[in-house]
Amino acid sequence: MEPTLEGQRVCPSLEGASNWYSTSFNPATGLYYVQTNDKCGVFTKIPAEWEAGKGFMGGSFVQAPGEPAQRVLRAIDLQTGKIVWEVPQTGPVTSWGGVLSTAGGIVIFGDDSGAMAAADAASGKPLWSFQMNQNWKASPMTYEFDNKQFIAVAAGSAIITFGLPD
C-alpha cells in the first residue's frame, strides 16, 4: 500500500499494534500477554525530489483524525490464537511499557494512565494500581536481593522499585 498525496489510512499505524513493548508467556495459564495500541494513521506522500546531502522523508504520518486510539492489555491463548481477556486502558496511548507475568499468577504492566498495575493472570481481573504519573518506555522486571523479591521499572526519568511482601 503506497502513501498518496491525499493520504492513505493504515491500521494499525506506525505506532499501533504491538511494537516495542516486551511480551510475556505464563506456562501455568498457557496465555501470552501483550500490550497493544489500537491506533490508525494516515500516511501522506510529499511531491518532493530527493537531493544528495539534504534530509528527505518523502512523506508524513499523523494519527487518523477523529479516530480515538486505545491501549489494551491482551491475554492470548497460544493453542487457539483467541483473545481470552482484555484490560482496556485510559490514556493518551503514548506508553510503550510491556508486561511481566509471574509464577504467583499476576501480570504487571504499565497502564497508559501512567500507573503500575497488576491483573490476575488467568482472568484479567484488575488487582491493584499505583499511580506513578510517568510515561512508560520500558517493561517491568523482577529480581531478588537478600531473599526479598522486588519489581522495578524505568519510567519517565526515574527508576522505580517496589519490594514485595513476604
Task: Please place each PLM-identified region on the residue numbering.
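Signature of short aromatic-glycine-proline-rich micro-motifs recurring in repeat-based ectodomains
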Residues: 6-22, 98
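Short, surface-exposed loop/turn motifs at beta-strand boundaries within globular domains
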Residues: 16-18, 25-27, 68, 80
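Substrate-binding clefts and catalytic carboxylate motifs of secreted carbohydrate-active enzymes
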Residues: 21-24, 28-35, 41-42
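Extracytoplasmic/lumenal domain signature
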Residues: 1-9, 39-94, 100-103, 107-166
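A general structural signal for short secondary-structure junctions and capping/turn motifs
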Residues: 14, 22-26, 143, 151
